[in-house]
C-alpha cells in the first residue's frame, strides 16, 4: 500500500488535532524507530534541514549519541519549524552542531568519508519545487562521497507523488518511509531498499 502526499498530511493533521497526539511525539517515534534500525553501526554523519524532516534527523542523532556512537550533525536551511527548534536546543547540549552556509562542503565531505553512515534528513515529502544550485551541489557531494546512505522518509530532492527529481536527489542504500510508503518512492530507484517505520498515525479501518 502506498499513500499520496495530501493523504499523509490529512492523517497527520487528524492525529494531532482530533486525537491530540503532539507532533513532537510522532517525531520522537519516527526518530526512535530509525535509530533501532541503524544502531548496529558506529559512526554517523547526519545532515538536517530545518523543517520536520530535519527534526526527525535530530532525534536520531540524540539517541545515537546517548548510546555511545560517533555522531556529527550538520544543519542546512533557513526557516526553522517549531519542532525542529526544540530538538535543536536539545542536541546542542550534547554535541557541537555544524552549519552549512555556503557551497564549501569540505568539512562535510571529510565527515561523510570518515563515517560509516550518512543520514539524509534535509527535505521531506513537502518538497515541491526545483532545487537551487546550492542544494544540487550538496546532494552531489553526498552521493559522491557517502559510504552508505539512508534517507529519513524520502530521499531529498524527490517528489513524494511522482518520483520526479527536482534537479537531482540523494541516491540511497535504504529509505525509511515514515508511517507509509509514498507513491513516488516506487517510481524512482534512488530510494534503494524501502522500509516502513511505524510512528502511531491514527487511521480508520477503511484507510
Regions found by a protein language model. Give the residues of each.
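Positively charged, low-complexity intrinsically disordered leader regions
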Residues: 1-41, 203-207
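YjeF_N-associated NAD(P)HX repair module
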Residues: 2-4, 115-207
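S-adenosylmethionine-dependent methyltransferases
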Residues: 28-33, 47, 71-74, 195-201
Amino acid at each position: 500500500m502506498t499513500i499520496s502526499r495530501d493523504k499523509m498530511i490529512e492523517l497527520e493533521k487528524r492525529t494531532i488535532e482530533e486525537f491530540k497526539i503532539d507532533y513532537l511525539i510522532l517525531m520522537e517515534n519516527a526518530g526512535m524507530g530509525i535509530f533501532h534500525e541503524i544502531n548496529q553501526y558506529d559512526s554517523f554523519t547526519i545532515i538536517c534541514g530545518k523543517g520536520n524532516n530535519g527534526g526527525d534527523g535530530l532525534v536520531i542523532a540524540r539517541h545515537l549519541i546517548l548510546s555511545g556512537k560517533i555522531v556529527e550533525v550538520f544543519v542546512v536551511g533557513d526557516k526553522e519549524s517549531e519542532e525542529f527548534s526544540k530538538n535543536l536546543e536539545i542536541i546542542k547540549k550534547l554535541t557541537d552542531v555544524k552549519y552549512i552556509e555556503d557551497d564549501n562542503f569540505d568539512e562535510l565531505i571529510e565527515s561523510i568519508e570518515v563515517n560509516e553512515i550518512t543520514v539524509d534528513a534535509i527535505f521531506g515529502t513537502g518538497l515541491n519545487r526545483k532545487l537551487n544550485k546550492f542544494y544540487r551541489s550538496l546532494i552531489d557531494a553526498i552521493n559522491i562521497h557517502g559510504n552508505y546512505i539512508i534517507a529519513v522518509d524520502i530521499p531529498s530532492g524527490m517528489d513524494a507523488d511522482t518520483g520526479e527529481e527536482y534537479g537531482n536527489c540523494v541516491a540511497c542504500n535504504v529509505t525509511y518511509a515514515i508511517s507509509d510508503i509514498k507513491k513516488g518512492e516506487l517510481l524512482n530507484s534512488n530510494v534503494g531498499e524501502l522500509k516502513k517505520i511505524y510512528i502511531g498515525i491514527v487511521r480508520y479501518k477503511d484507510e
